[in-house]
C-alpha cells in the first residue's frame, strides 16, 4: 500500500500552480501538494462555450468541471482562478482540428491543446503569478538525467499519457511536475478519498471536450459551412466505385460506412483533399513500410545527419510501440521505417519515439507514406 509521504516532488517548499480540470487526477495532485506544505494555487481554464456541455457526463472542461475544481480548492483552502482561454483555444485547437479534417487528416486535438494552451500559455501565466513550478495530473514521469530533465512513460501502462505530451519542450519539462506518474488510477482514487474529495469517484473524461455529443461533423460544418462536398470513391487499382459524402466523414483504415458494395472488404487507404477523392482497397493496401514526420520535437541527444537510430514508435495512442529505424531529414523532419510493416498510418496523427520508457521525441505524420 502506498503512502502519501512517498509521493513527493523532491523539492523544497515551493509555490506551485496546479492545472485543475475538475477531475480526480488534478484534484488529488492539489491536495497532495497542499498537505506537503507547498503554497498551491489552482488554475482552471475555460476553453470553450461550456454552456454546450453543462450536465454532460464524462466531458473535460465542462461547466460542472469548473464547479468541481472550485469546490476542491475551497475544501483545501487554496486560491483558485478560472481563466478565460476561449479565444486562444479556438485559434490553436478547434480551428486546427477543423482544418486538419478538411485536409484529409485525422487530427489529435488533445496534443495541440497540451502544446499550445495547457503548457505554453499556462506556464506563462504560472510564471507571472510567481510560481516556481506547474504541476498537472498527467500519468507521465519526469526523470532528471545526466543532460537534464527527461520525459518517461507513466508506471501504469493502462494510464500512460506520454503519447499526448511529446510536444513538451526541454525548457517546459524543467518547469513541470507530474506527481501521479508513479501511481495507478486506483491509487489516485484512494488518495483522493483519503483527502475527502467528492470527485474521488468521478468518471474519467471520454469525449473531445469541445464536442460534448461526439458529433465532430456538426462542429466542422458549423465552423466551415459546406465542408461536406461529395466526391468520388476510387479503388486503388484505378476504377471508380461510387460517391462519398465529404472527406471529413472518412479516416485511414475505416471499413464501415463506405456505402459501396464489393466482392471483398474495402478500407479507406488514402484521402486526396485537392481532388476530393477517397481511395479504398483491400486490407493489404493499408500496409506501410515508411513515412515522414514533420515539426519534430526532439528531447534527446541530437541525431547526426545520415545517422540511423533503432527505436520504438507509437502511431496511435491505443497501439503498442513498434520497432523502427529513424533518420533525420533537415531541421524538423524525420524518416521513420518500420522493421515490419504496419497498417493504417494516418496523416495528422502523432508518431512518438521511445527508447524503453523514455520519450525521445515525436512529430506529425505527413502524407509522405510508402
UniProtKB/Swiss-Prot annotation:
Catalytic activity: S-sulfanyl-L-cysteinyl-[protein] + uridine(34) in tRNA + AH2 + ATP = 2-thiouridine(34) in tRNA + L-cysteinyl-[protein] + A + AMP + diphosphate + H(+)
Stretches the record annotates as Interaction with tRNA: 159-161
GO molecular function: ATP binding; tRNA binding; tRNA-uridine 2-sulfurtransferase activity
Keyword Cell division carried by entry: no
EC number: 2.8.1.13
Xref: SUPFAM superfamilies: Adenine nucleotide alpha hydrolases-like
Residues under site feature: Interaction with tRNA: 138, 349
GO aspect biological process, one term: tRNA wobble position uridine thiolation
A GO-annotated cellular component: cytoplasm
A Pfam cross-reference name: tRNA_Me_trans_M
InterPro entries linked: MnmA-like, MnmA-like_C, MnmA-like_central, MnmA-like_central_sf, Rossmann-like_a/b/a_fold
Record's function text: Catalyzes the 2-thiolation of uridine at the wobble position (U34) of tRNA, leading to the formation of s(2)U34.
Similarity comment: family membership: Belongs to the MnmA/TRMU family.
Protein known as: tRNA-specific 2-thiouridylase MnmA
Lineage: Bacteria, Pseudomonadati, Pseudomonadota, Alphaproteobacteria, Rickettsiales
